[in-house]
């Protein structure tokens, strides 16, 4: 199966693989590997001008790898950020003998400085589109009572409300951000809109403030002030003051939230709202890798309620989540359950069924696409009908699995193949260069390999008969796929020492004489070797460690 191709796959040399050492290798192991490769690639050992030039290039690459890994600071940078981290401007002013954590902080600081140069080009658009659908005619029919009324025999499904909101952010400086937002709403033929402008300033690492001005056709001007402050490392407070101007006068409002981390996964909130819909609310939220739990209690005018909800997070590639909640108060009782799942890299689709008294039964469908949200609340019935609950539950499941199998999955597969092919084309030049370097390395190894084979044959030791690296197709259903393997017999024989061959847990593409023949796809290494005059065979994954010879690799010829 093809895998996504990362930029690191193309641009970063794997220095550990090049030296064939573990990522935890000691300085002695690094030095031994460096000396062995220096003896192989030193330019002075080759008289032919072309071979001498190739040896010089490979020798410099090996020397660069050793220089990086033998220095604790550059090795820490390379381990965390790869080769690109070493190329980041500003490391020359960093003190030596820093810990990996300090180096990580320094790298992030340098990244922030680079990002500040592009602040003016940044924006953070967010949008919501909500479309309310009245589908009660599907279940609440009055045919028997109104038989004389002429009309269509088909249920009447209509859109009874809509809401659209959009906001963008424009960073002015490293601490100031302007926010412009607007919204439009309509319900049963009546609508209105508003526009808001806010200016946010980060005053320190502990807090920020925001001024907001707004106006709309249904409500008068709005003036607001928001403040955020970290009181302690585990406690923060937010305050929102608002003044709503209208023909009836000024309506003030104040909302204050005090929050405290009870432990690393649990936060407690205490909220007081005065003025517009006064209320006191307290809640506890626990969020872990596999679950999200909320319990809340609100006392207020006009709504008082108790809420408990739970969400389970599955640890799969699609980030599936199932949730359920119970909410009871003076307005009635509502039970809600649903699920959501990632359908593409930037899209999450979810559906929930809401069953309540006196609200009835509703189906809520939500699609999150990047920073855009599309919400469709569908009101099915005002009564508690089992048929409505059944169709609201099973309908979305049937539609989802049908769409996923017939539309989404084939589309994503085609997109993935298209992206992979595009990446292969862009990497073609790099692959050609790697191939030429590998062929040059193999030519430089010939004399050393001849001596190694003579030594191994004299003591009935380890002889690499054949070795292949790349994509192997064994499944009959995939025979049409092209086999992409390269012969790596010589490079592996060159790594044999004292009748042993040891490869570390790293991609074999970085080994001397190797290159990646199928960028972005799964690869294996297959080795046929002879030890003590007996044939052995083994196949390992690209990033799997290998030690030979082993008795388990022996080819049984008795049968």
UniProtKB/Swiss-Prot annotation:
Keywords: Acetylation, Chaperone, Coiled coil, Membrane, Mitochondrion, Mitochondrion outer membrane, Phosphoprotein. GO terms for cellular component: MICOS complex; nuclear speck; SAM complex. The modification N-acetylalanine is found at residue 2. InterPro entries: DnaJ-like_C11_C, DnaJ_domain, DnaJ_domain_CS, DNAJC11-like_beta-barrel, J_dom_sf, Mito_inner_membrane_organizer. It holds the Pfam family DnaJ. It is found in: Mitochondrion; Mitochondrion outer membrane. Residues 14-82 form the J domain. One of its GO terms (biological process) is cristae formation. It is a peripheral membrane protein. Residues 417-457 form a coiled coil. The keyword Transmembrane helix does not apply. The keyword Chaperone applies. Required for mitochondrial inner membrane organization. Seems to function through its association with the MICOS complex and the mitochondrial outer membrane sorting assembly machinery (SAM) complex. Belongs to the DNAJC11 family. This is DnaJ homolog subfamily C member 11. The gene is DNAJC11.
């Amino acid at each position: 199966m093809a895998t996504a191709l990362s930029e690191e796959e193309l641009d970063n040399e794997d220095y550990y693989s090049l030296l064939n050492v573990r990522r935890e290798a000691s300085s002695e192991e690094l030095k031994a590997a460096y000396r062995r490769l220096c003896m192989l690639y030193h330019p002075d050992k080759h008289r032919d001008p072309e071979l001498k030039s190739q040896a010089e290039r490979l020798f410099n690459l090996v020397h660069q790898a050793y220089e990086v890994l033998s220095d604790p600071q550059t090795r820490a940078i390379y381990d965390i950020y790869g080769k690109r981290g070493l190329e980041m401007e500003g490391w020359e002013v960093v003190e030596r003998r820093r810990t990996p954590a300090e180096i990580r902080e320094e790298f992030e600081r340098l990244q922030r400085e680079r990002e500040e140069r592009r602040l003016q080009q940044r924006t953070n658009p967010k949008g919501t589109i909500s479309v309310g659908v009245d589908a009660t005619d599907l279940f609440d029919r009055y045919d028997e009572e109104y038989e004389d009324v002429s009309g269509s025999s088909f249920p009447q499904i209509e859109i009874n409300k809509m809401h659209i909101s959009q906001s963008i952010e424009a960073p002015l400086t490293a601490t100031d951000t302007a926010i412009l937002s607007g919204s439009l709403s309509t319900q049963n033929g009546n609508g209105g809109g508003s526009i808001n402008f806010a200016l946010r300033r980060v005053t320190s690492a502990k807090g920020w403030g925001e001024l907001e001005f707004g106006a709309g056709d249904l409500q008068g001007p709005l003036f607001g002030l928001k403040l955020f402050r970290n009181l302690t490392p585990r406690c923060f407070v937010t305050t929102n003051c608002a003044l709503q101007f209208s023909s009836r006068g000024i309506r003030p409002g104040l909302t204050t939230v005090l929050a405290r981390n009870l432990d690393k996964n649990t936060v407690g909130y205490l909220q007081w709202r005065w003025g517009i819909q006064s209320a006191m609310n307290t809640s506890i939220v626990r969020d872990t890798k596999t679950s999200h739990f909320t319990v809340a209690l609100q006392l207020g005018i006009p709504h008082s309620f108790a809420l408990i909800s739970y969400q389970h997070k599955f640890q799969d590639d699609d980030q599936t989540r199932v949730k359920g909640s119970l909410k009871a108060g003076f307005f009635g009782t509502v039970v809600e359950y649903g699920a959501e799942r990632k359908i593409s890299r930037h899209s999450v689709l979810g559906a929930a069924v809401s069953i309540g008294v006196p609200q009835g039964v509703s189906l809520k469908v939500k699609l999150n696409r990047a920073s855009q949200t599309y919400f469709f609340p569908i009101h099915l019935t005002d009564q508690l009908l089992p048929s409505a609950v059944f169709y609201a539950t099973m309908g979305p499941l049937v539609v989802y699995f049908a769409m996923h199998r017939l539309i989404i999955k084939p589309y994503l597969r085609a997109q993935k193949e298209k992206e992979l092919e595009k990446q292969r084309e862009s990497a073609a030049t790099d692959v050609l260069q790697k191939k030429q370097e590998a062929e040059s390395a193999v030519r430089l190894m010939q004399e050393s390999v001849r001596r190694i084979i003579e030594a191994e044959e004299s003591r009935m030791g380890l002889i690499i008969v054949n070795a292949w690296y790349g994509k192997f197709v064994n499944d009959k259903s995939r025979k049409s796929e092209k086999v992409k393997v390269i012969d790596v017999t010589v490079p592996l024989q060159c790594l044999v020492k004292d009748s042993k061959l040891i490869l570390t847990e790293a991609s074999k593409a970085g080994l001397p004489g190797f290159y990646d023949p199928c960028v972005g796809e799964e690869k294996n290494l297959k080795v046929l070797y002879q030890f003590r005059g007996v044939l052995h065979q083994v196949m390992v994954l690209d990033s799997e460690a290998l030690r030979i010879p082993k008795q388990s690799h022996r080819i049984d010829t008795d049968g």
